[in-house]
Swiss-Prot record:
<dbReference type="InterPro" id="IPR038135">
    <property type="entry name" value="Methylthiotransferase_N_sf"/>
</dbReference>
<feature type="binding site">
    <location>
        <position position="51"/>
    </location>
    <ligand>
        <name>[4Fe-4S] cluster 1</name>
    </ligand>
</feature>
<dbReference type="InterPro" id="IPR007197">
    <property type="entry name" value="rSAM"/>
</dbReference>
<keyword id="KW-0411">Iron-sulfur</keyword>
<dbReference type="InterPro" id="IPR023404">
    <property type="entry name" value="rSAM_horseshoe"/>
</dbReference>
<keyword id="KW-0408">Iron</keyword>
<dbReference type="InterPro" id="IPR005840">
    <property type="entry name" value="Ribosomal_uS12_MeSTrfase_RimO"/>
</dbReference>
<dbReference type="InterPro" id="IPR005839">
    <property type="entry name" value="Methylthiotransferase"/>
</dbReference>
<keyword id="KW-0479">Metal-binding</keyword>
<comment type="similarity">
    <text>Belongs to the methylthiotransferase family. RimO subfamily.</text>
</comment>
<dbReference type="GO" id="GO:0046872">
    <property type="term" value="F:metal ion binding"/>
</dbReference>
<feature type="domain" description="Radical SAM core">
    <location>
        <begin position="132"/>
        <end position="362"/>
    </location>
</feature>
<feature type="binding site">
    <location>
        <position position="153"/>
    </location>
    <ligand>
        <name>[4Fe-4S] cluster 2</name>
    </ligand>
</feature>
<feature type="domain" description="MTTase N-terminal">
    <location>
        <begin position="6"/>
        <end position="122"/>
    </location>
</feature>
<feature type="binding site">
    <location>
        <position position="150"/>
    </location>
    <ligand>
        <name>[4Fe-4S] cluster 2</name>
    </ligand>
</feature>
<dbReference type="GO" id="GO:0006400">
    <property type="term" value="P:tRNA modification"/>
</dbReference>
<protein>
    <recommendedName>
        <fullName>Ribosomal protein uS12 methylthiotransferase RimO</fullName>
        <ecNumber>2.8.4.4</ecNumber>
    </recommendedName>
</protein>
Amino acid sequence: MKNIMQSIFLLSLGCSKNTVDSERLIRQAELNGLHFTDQADDADIIIINTCGFIADAKEESINEILAATEKRHNGEIKALFVMGCLSALYSRELRAELPEVDHFFGTSDLEEIISVLGGSYRPSNIHERTLLTPPHYAWLKIAEGCSRTCSFCAIPKMRGRYRSEPIERLEKEASLLLKNGVRELNIISQDITQYGWDFDERSHLNDLLKKLAAQEFSWIRLLYAYPLHFPLDVIDTMREHANICNYLDMPVQHISDRILKSMQRGIDKKGTIGLLESIRKKNPDIRLRTTMIVGYPGETDREFDELLEFVAQLRFDRLGCFPYSHEEHTSAFKHLEDDIPEKIKKERVEALMELQESIAAERNRELEGRVMKVLVDEVEGSIAYARTEYDAPEVDNDVLVDIGDNPVQPGDFCTVTIEESSAYELHGRVNDC
């Protein structure tokens, strides 16, 4: 495809890992002289990077593809490409149902996409990205794929087995992000715990973290840690380095031994509680985020009550909850019946999140009167929307800061006195920036 004067609109759906893939694609295309637009109506080519994790994400991806196929059918665009997880999992079915799509790509087809766009893939520039996040924070994807066998998840089929990026390349990528103004580095993969196991069957996460902490990022944050074999020396390193946030995102999913075994998580209730207690003992100031699944096949009232009791006792600082989604290409889909009614799933989500809201409100009240360092994400008039080190981008608390007439900009660090709080917001006034 000739790239002369071609304008591309890229829609990136789904998780932060997908965002990084899109950022790499944009940069490789730009190096070949291709131009991107923020408006689909101005584009010659539309690329949709899809998500296929759960039913809602699939539906969103399909709806966006259908809207774009209408443009392709009407001649409003010259080409339509679909990439990402949904495309990887259902390429045959999508090709049969959507002939308007010119090309379908998987999750590791960057070189092929650039070639179809009329460019040449440049492996020496793979560490370069054009950020889709605000310029002051970025994701650092330290591995691709997943080798876990969780019964509810099709990620290994979408993205393949776990492949760690070499530490040297990640250092180079991080250094470039720092040079380009990134102040907060968020370390991600499907499972950061497993980083380096494919090198020599041990976690190298702590080795990597020390290397990154030596760079001059203001904040470094750890997201998506699997409980099994989590390296506790990471928590020691967290305490030793002021620029590593006292924050850990560790999806637990459930606490019932029967359900954890059925989920094929590799860890039981005793091991999970012991790990979380060890983490908090090593670092009393740490804030823990987790994710739960309710309505898993066969989940009884007693097992759900056990989960509620666990959450009430452990008092996670941040918690997200999903109703179980019976996904094709998973072990649970093949072997288990989706026997919990959607109404019950919804009620259980609401009950768990109501409990978590009360915990979060109590935890936030403890911060009232404190002076805290915050990172500003957005400014609207005299109000800045910011985050503490305990809050990851896009998913956690906002700090609403009265900045008066102070010249505060996104990306600024400020000290703020917290005056009021609710479950998911802090309110304060600026001291200095």
